[in-house]
């Protein structure tokens, strides 16, 4: 695909006003606060920031592992913002590949959920 074709095909990823809030007891932790990002199909993006700055949360939402609390996420022309759990699983199986930086548990999932996510991703 040449540059002209990739531009006419639209962005590979659009995130607008994305918020992710976790409830921790009676408190709320804001992991993302109105994040905006647009990535072209032929573009490479590096996320750099300190631990706890929201990089993993942003990637997890873009890849359909998490749903945003608010905002819009469009991947390859499909708005996945309000996908059900089943639709997200299908989306990940068809469209997403993850390479995690190390073999660690996902900290915001229970041990059972960590095992189930590996099972779901493997098909």
Could you describe each region identified by the protein language model?
Residues 8-12, 21-34:
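A short, flexible loop at the N-terminus of ABC-type nucleotide-binding domains that lies
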Residues 15-18, 30-40, 71:
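Conserved beta-strand
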Residues 26-29, 80-97:
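ABC ATPase NBD coupling module
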Residues 45-46, 98:
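Short beta-strand immediately N-terminal to the Walker A/P-loop
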Residues 71-79:
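Conserved ABC transporter NBD signature motif
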Residues 109-119:
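Short coil-to-helix segment of the ABC ATPase nucleotide-binding domain corresponding to the Q-loop/switch region
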């Amino acid at each position: 695909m040449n540059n002209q074709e990739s531009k006419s095909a639209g962005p590979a990823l659009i995130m607008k006003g994305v918020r992710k809030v976790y409830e921790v007891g009676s408190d709320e932790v804001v992991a993302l606060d109105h994040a905006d990002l647009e990535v072209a199909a032929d573009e490479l993006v590096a996320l750099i920031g300190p631990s706890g700055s929201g990089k993993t949360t942003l990637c997890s939402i873009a890849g359909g592992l998490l749903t945003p609390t608010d905002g819009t996420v469009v991947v390859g022309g499909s708005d996945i913002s309000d996908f059900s759990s089943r639709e997200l699983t299908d989306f990940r199986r068809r469209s997403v590949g993850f390479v995690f930086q190390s073999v660690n548990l996902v900290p915001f999932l229970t041990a059972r959920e960590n095992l189930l996510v590996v099972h779901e991703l493997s098909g």
